[in-house]
Regions:
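Glycine- and acidic
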Residues: 63-67, 82-91, 105-108, 128-137, ...
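Metal-dependent nuclease catalytic regions and adjoining charged, substrate-binding loops involved
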Residues: 13, 17, 21, 224-311
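Short, polar/flexible loop-turn hinges at active-site or ligand-entry regions and domain interfaces
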Residues: 88-95, 114-115, 207-210, 231-233, ...
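Active-site-adjacent bridging/hinge elements
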Residues: 73-83, 121-122, 188-199
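Hydrophobic (often cysteine-bearing) scaffold residues that line and stabilize catalytic clefts
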Residues: 79, 94, 98, 102, ...
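A non-catalytic, helix-rich entry segment at domain boundaries
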Residues: 101-174
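Mg2+/Mn2+-dependent nuclease catalytic core
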Residues: 169-269
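C-terminal, charged and often intrinsically disordered regions of DNA end-processing helicases
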Residues: 1-111, 309-311
Length: 311
């Protein structure tokens, strides 16, 4: 039997609102609400209250901040992007902390003199408790994989043909409504004086070559080059491309995905359209391969976990 609580009584009365007892049920609910029973107040019922606002996030010509990674994630699922932007994210995972550490060690190779692979590995081991405070074989295996990432990075660093301009370089450029801000892992210049952006990835699985050519994160970097985002470090505003370098891929050979020189006019229009959508009042939820591990699926209207009780 249903427990004899005020919430249960109200629930029974609400279920009667669609029956021949509707008039009596409504009168009792009204009386309970006037007596201070919160669950009897229709304004507390999910699906009854009006939207708090229908105004766009960024009205008119107000700029919209677009990071290179958010441009990519927004096109995958606008709802996920909005919920995460609004605070719907978990704390940093060990994988995220490790990724940040590997990027920092890769930057040290350029920023400090006398850095060798052995030095980087030693720094990693000394700071491991900060990355993964757990003990046991799982942590040990993770550390071995991290050391392998450093080895792969060193192979790339020693064999690359372009000159390093700088590492961990921030940029801030404006394209229409979009204010593109971010940081590149590494900026290189080729023999012709053109700039090439490198983004290190610690994930294991590279995207396809076709997806790399359309990757919005890399396109954003190339737009930043063209818009003078790195003129403080190098005079060139000509891009010769960009690449994702996968340090976590379990093979001896460095796995990379390059993006050739883009059509700047088309890329700018693409980013501007994304900025317009990011500043809108509504966001579309989309089903894709990342739904299974999505941290905000409990709020997603197209997933069972996130549907409202009133459709």
């Amino acid at each position: 039997p249903r427990p004899s609580t005020t919430a249960a009584v109200v629930a029974d009365l609400r279920s009667s609102l669609q029956s021949e007892k509707a008039t009596d049920a409504a009168a009792i609910i009204k009386s309970l609400s006037e007596s201070g029973i919160h669950s009897a107040d229709p304004q507390s019922w999910t699906g009854v209250a009006q939207l708090s606002t229908t105004e766009p996030i960024s009205p008119g010509n107000a700029p919209v901040a677009v990071s290179p990674s958010s441009a990519e994630s927004f096109t995958e699922c606008g709802m996920k992007w909005f919920l995460e932007k609004s605070g719907g994210t978990d704390g940093d995972s060990i994988a995220q902390v490790l990724g940040s550490a590997i990027h920092a060690f890769a930057a040290l190779m350029v920023q400090e003199e006398g850095i060798t692979e052995a030095v980087l590995v030693e720094k990693l081991k000394k700071s491991w408790n900060l990355i993964d405070p757990q003990e046991g074989w799982v942590s040990k295996t993770s550390q071995e994989k991290a050391i392998a990432m450093i080895t792969r990075f060193m192979k790339y660093h020693m064999k690359h043909e372009r000159e390093v301009v700088g590492v961990e370089l921030g940029f801030d450029v404006t394209v229409g409504k979009a204010r593109i801000r971010g940081t590149v892992d590494r900026l290189e210049v080729d023999s012709a004086g053109n700039l090439f952006v490198i983004d290190f990835k610690t994930s294991k699985t590279p995207i396809s070559y076709e997806k790399a050519e359309q990757n919005l994160q890399l396109k954003s970097y190339q737009i930043a080059v063209a818009e003078g985002g790195f003129t403080a470090q190098h005079a060139s505003t000509t891009s010769s491309g960009a690449a994702l370098i996968y340090l976590g891929h379990d093979i001896q050979k460095i796995s990379s995905r390059e993006q050739g020189v883009i059509n700047l006019e088309e890329a700018r229009a693409e980013i501007e359209n994304i900025a317009q959508s990011m500043g809108a009042a509504q966001f579309v939820a989309a089903t894709n391969s990342r739904c299974k591990e999505c941290p905000v699926k409990s709020s997603c209207p197209i997933k069972a976990e996130g549907r409202t009780v009133i459709e």
